[in-house]
Curated annotation (Swiss-Prot):
Superkingdom to which the source organism belongs: Bacteria
Enzyme class: hydrolase
Native species: Caulobacter sp. (strain K31)
EC numbers, comma separated: 3.5.-.-
Protein name listed in UniProt: 3-aminoacrylate deaminase RutC
Protein family membership: Belongs to the RutC family.
Reaction it catalyzes: (Z)-3-aminoacrylate + H2O + H(+) = 3-oxopropanoate + NH4(+)
The keyword Cell membrane appears for this protein: no
GO molecular function: deaminase activity
Function: Involved in pyrimidine catabolism. Catalyzes the deamination of 3-aminoacrylate to malonic semialdehyde, a reaction that can also occur spontaneously. RutC may facilitate the reaction and modulate the metabolic fitness, rather than catalyzing essential functions.
One example of a Gene Ontology biological process annotation: uracil catabolic process
GO cellular component terms given for this protein: cytosol
């Protein structure tokens, strides 16, 4: 099964050996996405609303670069550092998924750098390769 690496225009260099997304068999797999600034530092440290919005915009960019839309998302994997941010993350999340909601799960855990509060990985079915 061939795969295509998805790198949206203007995307910075990842800090680890991964691609922002891959497309295979009509499915877009979006890597775990964090809110980095242009210098690969934490953007909006400890701000759940701003980070969630930035993360979802980045995910949207990957999916749109692959030829899909956020309506094509079938699964989200959400990692948060503190359950006290859960409702804030949900509020922003609902803006990006106003209709039928994709499947998802949330896990509380530590993230790669202090100041990050949310990481999201997504899967979208766009029906083409």
């Amino acid at each position: 099964m061939p795969k295509t690496v998805i790198i949206p225009p203007g995307t910075g260099t990842p800090i680890a050996p991964f691609s922002p997304g891959t497309l295979a068999d009509g499915i877009v797999y979006v890597s775990g996405t964090l809110a980095f600034d242009k210098d690969n530092n934490v953007a909006n440290p400890d701000d759940a609303e701003a980070q969630t919005r930035q993360v979802l915009e980045t995910i949207k960019s990957v999916i749109e670069t692959a030829g899909g839309t956020m309506d094509d998302v079938t699964m989200n994997h959400i990692f948060l550092t503190d359950w006290s941010n859960y409702q804030t993350i949900n509020k922003v999340y609902a803006e990006y998924f106003p209709g039928d909601k994709p499947a998802r799960y949330c896990i509380q855990c530590g993230l790669v750098k202090p100041g990050f509060v949310v990481e999201i990985a997504s899967v979208a079915h766009i029906g083409k390769t």
